[in-house]
């Protein structure tokens, strides 16, 4: 799985209430959530982000309350992958469960600026800043977790496994 897009960079401790404000939790429609992704942080984010773009953030991304709405909103607005120095554990699990590819790599975050063209090879854990000609190495996910993300999330993965057994 290789993702390529423009970087949108933000800071440390972006919590789930900033990713998708609580006032929009009355819906679980991904398209509706996408319209409001990060709006309290960056009013223009949904207008700037293009399908395939990559979100880059600092430490503890996705902290705060556990809401699956946060990674759903990010994925639905077109972001292909999130690179952060670290993720809050509940966001980490929710992202994998809904099929949003995520990567932890401090060096990459430090070496990527907003607007840089970035390529992420999730299988091998290689992150390239194509704008600056730099390459970073992250720890790749175990194969079973890659398969969950490749399937589009845990539910789709389980459905596929059940079909194999049928």
UniProtKB/Swiss-Prot annotation:
GO terms for molecular function: 3-isopropylmalate dehydratase activity. SUPFAM superfamilies: LeuD/IlvD-like. The gene is leuD. Pathway: Amino-acid biosynthesis; L-leucine biosynthesis; L-leucine from 3-methyl-2-oxobutanoate: step 2/4. Belongs to the LeuD family. LeuD type 2 subfamily. It holds the Pfam family Aconitase_C. GO terms for biological process: L-leucine biosynthetic process. This is 3-isopropylmalate dehydratase small subunit. Heterodimer of LeuC and LeuD. It catalyses: (2R,3S)-3-isopropylmalate = (2S)-2-isopropylmalate. InterPro entries: Aconitase/3IPM_dehydase_swvl, AconitaseA/IPMdHydase_ssu_swvl, IPMI_Swivel, LeuD, LeuD/DmdB_bac, LeuD_type2/HacB/DmdB. The keyword Metal-binding does not apply. The keyword Transmembrane does not apply. Keywords: Amino-acid biosynthesis, Branched-chain amino acid biosynthesis, Leucine biosynthesis, Lyase. Catalyzes the isomerization between 2-isopropylmalate and 3-isopropylmalate, via the formation of 2-isopropylmaleate. Its EC number is 4.2.1.33.
């Amino acid at each position: 799985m290789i993702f390529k897009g423009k970087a949108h960079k933000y800071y440390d401790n972006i919590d789930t209430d900033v990713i998708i404000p609580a006032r929009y939790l009355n819906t679980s429609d991904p398209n509706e959530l996408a319209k409001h992704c990060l709006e309290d942080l960056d009013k223009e984010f949904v207008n700037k982000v293009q399908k395939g773009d990559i979100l880059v953030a600092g430490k503890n991304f996705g902290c705060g309350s556990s809401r699956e709405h946060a990674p759903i909103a990010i994925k639905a607005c077109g972001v292909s992958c999130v690179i952060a120095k670290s993720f809050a554990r509940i966001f980490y699990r929710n992202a994998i469960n809904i099929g949003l590819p995520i990567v932890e790599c401090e060096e990459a975050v430090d070496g990527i600026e907003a607007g840089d063209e970035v390529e992420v090879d999730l299988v091998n854990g290689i992150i390239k800043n194509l704008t600056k000609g730099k390459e970073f190495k992250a720890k790749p996910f175990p194969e079973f977790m890659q398969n969950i993300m490749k399937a589009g999330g845990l539910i789709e993965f389980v459905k596929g496994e059940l079909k194999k057994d049928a």
